[in-house]
Amino acid sequence: MKTQFAILLIALVLFQLLSQSDAFLSTIWNGIKSLLGRRGLNELDNLDELFDGEISQADIDFLKELMS
């Protein structure tokens, strides 16, 4: 009975590892496909809009308020 329970636990752990690694690897593969795809390289330019290098006076005032 102990052996069967141990085999069941080992099988469950291995199944969980397999299912999680499958999801992880498919996410990596989809990321690679989107980067190397025909439109993937053109859409990387949209990431530049996420960063605004200018800090306004309101931002500085807010940071000072947070620090005090």
UniProtKB/Swiss-Prot annotation:
Keyword set includes Acyltransferase: no
Distribution of this protein across tissues and organs: Expressed by the venom gland.
Entry's localization field: Secreted; Target cell membrane
CC terms in the record's Gene Ontology section: extracellular region; membrane; other organism cell membrane
Sequence positions bearing Leucine amide: 36
GO biological process terms on file: defense response to bacterium; defense response to fungus; killing of cells of another organism
Presence of the UniProt keyword Nucleus in the record: no
Main location: secreted
Keywords: Amidation, Antibiotic, Antimicrobial, Cleavage on pair of basic residues, Cytolysis, Fungicide, Hemolysis, Membrane, Secreted, Signal, Target cell membrane, Target membrane
Range of residues in the leader sequence: 1-23
The protein's role, per its UniProt record: Amphipathic peptide that possesses relatively strong activities against Gram-positive bacteria and a fungus, but has very weak antimicrobial activities against Gram-negative bacteria. Also exhibits mild hemolytic activities against human erythrocytes (16 uM induce 70% of hemolysis). Furthermore, this peptide potently inhibits the growth of vancomycin-resistant Enterococcus (VRE) S13, a pathogen that can cause a number of human infections.
Family classification: Belongs to the non-disulfide-bridged peptide (NDBP) superfamily. Short antimicrobial peptide (group 4) family.
Name under which the protein is recorded: Pantinin-3
